[in-house]
Amino acid sequence: MTGGWHRAVLLSGLLFGSLAASRAASGQSTAGGVAATPLVAPADAKAFSPTLEDVPYPYPVHFLPLTLYGHEVRMAYMDVPPAGAANGRAVVLLHGMNFYGEYWASTIDVLRQAGFRVIVPDQVGFGRSSKPIMPYTLSDMAANTHALLHTLGLSNAAIVGHSMGGMVATRFALLYPGETERLVLYNQIGLTDARLQRPPTPTDQVYKQLLGETYDQVYRGLARYFPTGVVPDSFQKYVLRQYGWTLSGNWPQAAMVRALVQQMVYEDPVVYDWAHIKSKTLEIGGDKDGPDFPTLAKHVADTIPGARLVLIPGVGHVPHVQSPDIFFRELLKFLRS
């Protein structure tokens, strides 16, 4: 490991973005996090399609046809050209489990202004892509991303993966090292082998739990991303959309897909991939993404040869929303280095 490159950088800075004011109607509290009583869905909550036809994306969405396990499916993606002078390089942004390409809007704009072509897929099973009931694996997601880059005529790109997308990015870098010009693992999950920590849960049990998901459960699941335990106003739309899926007539199929993906995260660890990654790597994330994240993130950086670690203080799971100035500064510094 090169001593000059491999170092942990702890950044100081303010937490950007205002947090939500107290929502008395739903029982939320900004002072002490979310109230103990179950939260009630706001009056304006409505059904959302799990394939997000009713959610505007920041750039045109295209579709790549694929055949997977006998299913003819479509993989949605955005292919956004540079806004200024092109630098001839491309960046792929891989979303997390609770998200889809749309939430990368601000990141796309920053990268394209810096001269990058930006490719943003919705993995099959997410966003505007098809949602077949089939096996889901990280290797398949990496292969689908590889197929997309091949179709777009790209021989390599910088791969940026957030949350579950960090697991996909890890597997992509392992399987396609020649195509991984750089690797950014951004608040990735899967930092341990969960199979060694808890017994498996049957898929049907996970499915039944998801079928009965409430607004309170959706809110609290996303509130964990923020150190205050409160979802900011700017992020509330993701709570309403995810809850809105449960009101859709298509929720039973979408819930099964989510159950299968959750099983994938448990059954398909990436911890054994890190030592074999050859790409120049940045491990970056908010240091308040759970009590163990700084230690586990350092372990990742120590295991990937030559990796660099950047921890952003006071920030949780979504720094490009919570602390955009620092996050984008560090991302561009790494991509340009």
Regions found by a protein language model. Give the residues of each.
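Flexible "cap/lid" loop of the alpha/beta hydrolase fold
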Residues: 174, 183-213
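Conserved alpha/beta-hydrolase catalytic His-Asp/Glu region
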Residues: 194-199, 212-275
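Active-site loop/oxyanion-hole signature of alpha/beta-hydrolase fold enzymes
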Residues: 67-71, 78-84, 113, 123-160, ...
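Short beta-strand/loop motif that positions the catalytic acidic residue
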Residues: 277, 283-285
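Conserved HGGG/HGGXW glycine-rich cap/lid loop of the alpha/beta-hydrolase fold
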Residues: 73, 80-128
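Catalytic active-site module of serine/aspartate enzymes centered on a nucleophile-bearing elbow/loop
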Residues: 306-337
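Alpha/beta-hydrolase fold catalytic core
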Residues: 5, 15-16, 22-89, 113-116, ...
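Acidic catalytic loop of the alpha/beta-hydrolase fold
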Residues: 288-292
